[in-house]
Amino acid sequence: MDAVRFVESCEEGFVAATVTPRHLLLNRNVLFQGRLQPHNHCLPVLKREIHRQAIVSAVTSGSKRFFLGTDGAPHERRRKECPCGCAGIYNAPVALALYAKVFEEVGALDKLEAFTSLNGPDFYGLPRNTSKIKLIKTSWKVPESFSFSFGDIIPMFAGETLVASILLITRKSVFTNRL
């Protein structure tokens, strides 16, 4: 709440905030569901539900001061599930579907494009990306993990069913990701 108020109180064009999917969807309760949940540990630490709601309200309001910032953290399982585990949540495979979920839930899908694709480059004075994506409303299951030569990475919402897949349309090709 305080961070949202601070960003909103500053002169437009000088201060903005990137917002992660985890801070839009999770509160501190998910850290301790039954026992410590290391794959939900991140920095800044998740706050109370009232804070999450304030962030959702700010992000879906259409304000140009807030934009996508996945802050993906692909730490290997063994570096998360240990006494001094790394902070961060790996959300790259699910980020766009999760942002779409939040915007749809509050009836603000018309503001999703600006949040994900326009506000950031405009704030930094960068050119806007000319590639296009299309979200397709379909159910898919998030993989339990992704295996790499260096170890397994557990994604945000591993094993859960999400609604939305991504069709990426570039100038040269079409790429479908059902994740």
Segments from the language model and where they lie:
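Histidine/acidic residue-rich metal-binding segments in metalloenzymes
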Residues: 1-68
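Short, solvent-exposed polar/charged micro-motifs at secondary-structure junctions
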Residues: 4-7, 27, 123-125, 142-145
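His/Asp/Glu-enriched, well-ordered alpha-helical/loop segment
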Residues: 61-128
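Proline-rich low-complexity regions
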Residues: 41-46, 74, 143, 155
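Short, glycine-/Ser/Thr-/acidic-enriched flexible segments
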Residues: 22, 73-75, 140
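C-terminal cap of metal-dependent C-N hydrolases
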Residues: 130-178
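Metal-cofactor-binding active-site regions of metalloenzymes
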Residues: 1, 127, 132
